Amino acid sequence: VTPVSFIDEAIYLALEKGVTICTFGDLVRVPGTNMSLAGAREQGAKIHVVYSPADAEKYAGEHPDEQVTFLSVGFETTTPAGCLSVKAAREDGLDNYSILVANKTMPQAYEALKDSADVFLYPGHVNAITGTRLCEALTEEGVSGVVAGFTAKELMTALAVALVKFQEGKPFFVNCYPRVVTQDGSREAQLLVDEMMEACDCEWRGLGVIPRSGMKLRQEWQEFDARLKYQMPKIEGKPNPACRCGDVLQGKCKPSDCKVFGKGCTPQHPIGACMVSGLSLIHISEPTR
């Protein structure tokens, strides 16, 4: 759900400001308005793939002659690691490290989408951080959901529970991933993020702007905010009108309903971000269409 504009911002930093971009591998092929980070690399941009924000901070320390920006994306699961990298950069005295933040929070997305869903399949790893209390509270608004794990057995169990409970005809919440997810979640991770980040309005690819669903660094940490550090202009991305990732994410259509699915849009040449990740429904569906 990282928007086109974020990819365009990263490309701007790389090509216009000469910044070395550190990023997770999947993000390299996500399309921007005119190109992806892979395309920018072909034009001379320095795009360095890392496995964690800590790797990006380490790279900055080892290359003091380069300005380094980590692309901080993901949800509650990955946000704490980005925060820790900023803390480490301050402790290490690095003035060449920053993060471009596009982290998102799920509760606001649930609120925005609750009227269009019968049942939410809540992501287990997110709830491992946030806990389940917010999801439980949504049942009072008539919203049903189950927390699922990530193995095939865990997913099928959660779906089976959801189907049975849905047929009972009243709002419900069931934690089907209790070995990892608790009511309170990770207080340590929550406190870290609360210390360093604050909520902001945020654009989701295919879903538009969801109020207070994004994160940004608090004022006391803003020297590590790439947008402020490089006085970046407002960049308005232009999504490909043929892309239906947003509709697929909301369950409004199947991947095969998209006119470019498996034709103009393939894992090798993705038009939408959902075709990039090997874990996405669209990517998984493509070989069997």
What are these model-predicted stretches?
Residues 71, 75-134:
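Phosphate/pyrophosphate-binding betaalpha-module
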